[in-house]
Design a protein with these regions (language model features):
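Anion-binding and metal-coordination hotspots
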Residues: 1-291
Length: 291
């Protein structure tokens, strides 16, 4: 989960068009070889980006929008045996493989979240707070439909159709890795998601209006370094086997005092760090000089 580098783009540029230049720069900067594999979720990808990855000869593992596949592929997916932790492959003519896995844990989570969303919809429907403007594909509003006489209702048919996909997850790859390895590599994206949560949460990173490009670059650099320091502290906590999270360590460290004393006899100075509480003592090893 260590951050290695970053690239800056104009704020008005669509982020879907920033990936290829960023990958090219990253590969060149670190002189990466042919075993370099791009892993990305479906939100960052479009047909143009996938085509550019193929043209550049990159290997990739991408999240698949299995509900948007063609009729024959969707029929194949829904006909698969739903056995926990099983995966199936469908080879495409362009050399890609569509890997579909099933997870009981994911199925239960998706069913639970959908039921909660539908419950909120039904409550809003009964109170008369649903309007035709809410008939869209955002969130659980996708279960709403509007009739010819402009009456909004909840579609039980759409709900039943959505249930069929519970627990199913798709991945697209042009690598030779086996399905289990592909899925494991893709699931590593949770580290990236956690990085964003830490940046916005613990580190409280926020956009700031700057007048010059130099100030923008400095702001991003400071944010990058702050997260890198956070990850290094996390690593040291693990090495020293400290049973505390980074946030709690930081809170405790803020209350530790170091004093500097001048000896009246000879004018020399010595410093001493005061560890006064149990929490202070628990993180004392972090203050020891490196060996």
């Amino acid at each position: 989960g260590y951050p290695l580098s970053y690239s800056l783009f104009n704020g008005s540029q669509y982020e879907g068009f920033t990936m290829i230049p960023m990958i090219d720069d990253f590969k060149q900067r670190f002189t990466l070889g042919a075993d370099f594999v791009v892993v990305a979720d479906s939100g960052l990808m479009n047909k143009n980006n996938v085509a550019l990855l193929q043209e550049a000869g990159y290997k990739y593992i991408l999240g698949a929008r299995i509900k948007n596949e063609g009729a024959s592929v969707k029929q194949w997916i829904l006909s698969l045996e739903k056995k926990d932790k099983t995966s199936y492959e469908h080879k495409r003519q362009n050399g890609e493989r569509l890997i579909v896995s099933y997870s009981e844990k994911r199925a239960k989570k998706e069913a639970y979240n959908r039921n909660r969303g539908i419950a909120r919809l039904r409550k809003a429907y009964k109170s008369g707070h649903i309007t035709k403007q809410q008939v869209n594909k955002r969130g659980y509003n996708k279960f709403l439909e509007i009739s010819k006489d402009i009456e909004v209702s909840i579609s039980e048919e759409k709900i039943a159709e959505d249930c069929k996909w519970d627990g199913l997850k798709g991945y697209i790859t042009n690598t030779d890795l086996d399905a289990e390895r592909v899925i494991a590599q893709y699931h590593g994206l949770w580290v990236v998601e956690r990085a964003f949560r830490i940046s916005k949460g613990t580190l409280e990173m926020r956009p700031i209006f700057h007048f010059t490009e130099r100030r923008i670059e400095a702001h991003i650099c400071i944010c990058f370094i702050a997260y890198k320091v956070y990850k290094e502290l996390e690593r040291l906590i693990g090495i020293n086997k400290i049973d505390m999270g980074v946030d709690h360590v930081l809170d405790a460290a803020k209350t530790i005092t170091t004093i500097r004393i001048k000896m009246p006899e000879n004018g020399t100075y010595f410093t001493k760090t005061l560890f006064l509480t149990e929490k202070h003592l628990a993180i004392k090893s972090l203050f020891d000089p490196p060996k």
